[in-house]
Amino acid sequence: MKGTAASALLVALSATAAQARPVVDERFPYTGPAVPIGDWVDPTINGNGKGFPRLVEPPAVKPATANPRNNVNVISLSYIPKGMHIHYQTPFGLGQLPAVRWGKDPRNLNSTAQGYSHTYDRTPSCSQVKAVTQCSQFFHEVSIDGLEPDTTYYYQIPAANGTTQSEVLSFKTSRPAGHPGSFSVAVLNDMGYTNAHGTHKQLVKAATEGTAFAWHGGDLSYADDWYSGILACADDWPVCYNGTSSTLPGGGPLPEEYKKPLPAGEIPDQGGPQGGDMSVLYESNWDLWQQWLNNVTLKIPYMVLPGNHEASCAEFDGPHNILTAYLNDDIANGTAPTDNLTYYSCPPSQRNFTAYQHRFRMPGPETGGVGNFWYSFDYGLAHFVSIDGETDFANSPEWNFAEDVTGNETLPSESETFITDSGPFGNVNGSVHETKSYEQWHWLQQDLAKVDRSKTPWVIVMSHRPMYSSAYSSYQLHVREAFEGLLLKYGVDAYLSGHIHWYERLYPLGANGTIDTAAIVNNNTYYAHNGKSITHIINGMAGNIESHSEFSDGEGLTNITALLDKVHYGFSKLTIFNETALKWELIRGDDGTVGDSLTLLKPSHVAGGKKLHS
């Protein structure tokens, strides 16, 4: 690609503000169905009683009337420096600025904070959805800053344009950096709805029993699996839903929900009991999943970062290219001679992380990062860093148009694009093939360099994609090339990830996957050997419609893996005890027991030092 062409394209594509907003290219028309629906038996938006069941989840605020015309359906909390952000969602606009009344006394909410609203032309719109309490299209952001640390505050969302006033709710602000008290965090990845009921139950329990916050490392809701129920079972995919004849990877017992007979007219398929993860509509998957999580996101901050399932409406075609026929030519239950899915195959509202950017609000703007993609925050003795393992680095899994073009092109042709093309969400100055050209790399370097290890001796980084695993994939090399050097240089203690749908704890690894034997005390205790090695944990077992991962033919455990569990679902509990010890525990979803534990120790002379890199 010519340098001038690349520069022009990157200027057009790069984000221009810290709070990224989706930019969707529409040079070529979308030619698929008005509303893609993954159910040939019931291809309706609201359901006709046939086909796959249509779920209903309670909204965050119970409406005061039986037939509301607007409602607050989702409420979620997230940290901002010295405060809290309150995000809430409604099907229709408020007719005024969103607001929150708040105070320290639940009987005297004597302060009011206002914010802003945003929306997108979702497919289908909420005006096409009959149930007002099951749809979100307007997203409201209210930040309350200047708050006291480690303090409980109360708040209420007032009624506006037909919504019902919320109950008086509460949140607890973050502990200040350096606070010596112990705390726990719920860490999860790859959580949909199907196969995640146990994880959800344990997560709700954790949220009510004092867990400080939840940290979800990508793949939220599995909205892009809306079409799994129309894909016939295939030999190269281990999931086949067929009632009591269903087959799933992992080797565990068949979940009860899979024993339900297929609805009349449906075929054995690559999906699950709902067709898609929760719904046969992309946007309804998002709506239902967020409402299912209300009893967590209302109680504790829910911090998120991007995964591959947030990028677009689909990742791949199915048998006989059934999705190409449907999305490109509006032919239901058809076939196509070739897989021809492109960036333009998805409805415009289902491209380029659009839903993800609207449905959450992370502290990118406040921490020098970008939107929900990369940001950091302190809590007590730890500094937490969320990075984007999907876009915005060289050879990223979801690349941008600049990597599609050839010759002197400034934009790719339709056929040169891929369905998951996304970003960049930060600025790019230089070649797209050099990670140091990307804003994210420079932000990460600056963020890690500023960490005061005398206050936050523990530094934990998470992205969706692992750097290493016994299940090797080429993206792991690119993630390492982008970030591993910085993490080692600045003495990061642990790198957390998901993407692979199992639990895999690795031995401490230095550059190029060298096992740091000096950091291994025993199989369940490591030293934080800052600058020499990093503890890597793959935490992708929360549960979703795709079930567990399996090794490909010829693969198996390698010597970097200390423990592998590809049978159980669950999340992980990270407990920071003090400046020299933390504990990591796998919490099994089926019974809440501990399936694995790791203690990470840090010598006191290292924990108190500010400079941990050469």
From Swiss-Prot:
EC code(s) of this entry: 3.1.3.2
GO cellular component: extracellular region
UniProt GO MF annotations: acid phosphatase activity; metal ion binding
Gene3D superfamilies: 3.60.21.10, Purple acid phosphatase-like, N-terminal
Signal sequence bounds: 1-22
Glycan attachment residues as annotated in the record: N110, N161, N242, N295, N333, N340, N352, N408, N429, N512, N523, N559, N578
Annotated propeptide span(s): 606-614
Catalytic activity annotation: a phosphate monoester + H2O = an alcohol + phosphate
The entry's keywords: Copper, Glycoprotein, Hydrolase, Secreted, Signal
Ranges where the Fibronectin type-III domain occurs: 80-176
InterPro entries membership: Acid_Pase_Asper, Calcineurin-like_PHP_ApaH, FN3_dom, Metallo-depent_PP-like, MPP_PAP, PPA-like, Purple_acid_Pase-like_N, Purple_acid_Pase_N
Activity regulation: Competitively inhibited by phosphomycin and inorganic orthophosphate.
Cofactor: Cu cation
Alphabetized PROSITE patterns for the sequence: FN3
Complexes and interactors: Monomer.
Protein name per the record: Acid phosphatase
Organism listed in the record: Aspergillus ficuum
